[in-house]
Amino acid sequence: MNCDEIIKKLLLNPVHNTAATRGPAGENCESNQRTYTRISRLAAFQSAQTQESTPKTNGTGRATTEGLTEAEVRWLVMESRALFMSQPMLVEIAAPVRICGDVHGQYTDLLRLFDLGGFPPDANYIFLGDYVDRGDQSLERICLLLAYKLSFPETFFLLRGNHECSSINRIYGFFDECKRRYSVRLWKQFTDTFNCMPVAGLVEGRILCMHGGLSPELTDLDQIRRILRPTDVPDSGLICDLLWSDPSTNMESNWSENDRGVSWTFSESVVKSFNKKFDLDLICRAHQVVDAGYEFFAARQLVTVFSAPNYCDEFDNAGAFMCVDENFMCSFIRIEPTRTLLKYFF
């Protein structure tokens, strides 16, 4: 699907607009029209064949993304913040749905994912976080995803990952990209919006989704619902664990310190006990590269989904996403790596 087709998909559907609830009817109509125009331009960033965008200037000397001014990106980010705040921290999602893991800044691979799974609104989606960093097109990626979120707020969901945090994306690329192509001010506005994103999703009450994993502090799902926003990601505690923890085999105890230096690793028995307590069929999380794009754990009661193939140009991994159909049958679609990396042995 090319950019023109993406635009048509977006323009055929109503767009969520927080401004539409304010002012006289004429102002609402004008505001909605501006929304349509902006969303369509967002989708027109690049075609699936484009490997790298070429920054342009907006007449003031400020570098801008192809066809999009800083004011328009800022508008998108602020509207998305309002939408996130209007929805719960634990979003409840109906099947059918596609569940996608880390995508980072690999924009053309995102378009490949939509080619395989169906472009919204032909398919419903929940993404498990990590939209920015470790790629040269984080802005294209996060802006297109936010545009879809605004266009289809009840069928397109974005969870927060550990890279949607200022202390992380300041180091791993997103801050530098915002500064180079727009401004530090825009990066700060992205940070404010990331601080309002939901941290977990529940598909038909049976599949619990998050970016990282479980927490020893999580004893009631209402704890997630009660998290106040906006919030940064603390160094420890429930939010930190939902975004940072990992499953691990061959553990001597149920919980151990994570080698990442933050949060925990948890055992198979933790997963099985948690699912039994909350009557869950599956925990679906992301956060770790896996060769096939997905990998089961704890007798298929947890699955890791990773959707960025050839991650960072350092791995030969495939990407994948999970499809949950109307009958709650689960299957996986792989995003094959486009190149084989050379390995040298000494």
From Swiss-Prot:
Cofactor(s) recorded in Swiss-Prot or TrEMBL: Mn(2+)
Record-listed E.C. numbers: 3.1.3.16
Top EC group: hydrolase
Substrates-to-products reaction catalysed: O-phospho-L-seryl-[protein] + H2O = L-seryl-[protein] + phosphate; O-phospho-L-threonyl-[protein] + H2O = L-threonyl-[protein] + phosphate
Active site as annotated: H163 (proton donor)
Binding site residues for Mn(2+) 2: D130, N162, H211, H287
One CC-aspect GO term: cytoplasm
GO molecular function: metal ion binding; protein serine/threonine phosphatase activity
Matches recorded under CDD domains: MPP_PP1_PPKL
Keywords tagged on the record: Hydrolase, Manganese, Metal-binding, Protein phosphatase
Record note on cofactor: Binds 2 manganese ions per subunit.
Disordered: annotated segments: 46-65
Keyword Manganese: yes
Residues at which Mn(2+) 1 binds: D102, H104, D130
InterPro entries on file: Calcineurin-like_PHP_ApaH (IPR004843), Metallo-depent_PP-like (IPR029052), PP1_catalytic_subunit (IPR050341), Ser/Thr-sp_prot-phosphatase (IPR006186), STPPase_N (IPR031675)
Family designation: Belongs to the PPP phosphatase family. PP-1 subfamily.
Miscellaneous information on this protein: Trypanosoma brucei contains two PP1 genes which are highly similar.
Protein name: Serine/threonine-protein phosphatase PP1(4.8)
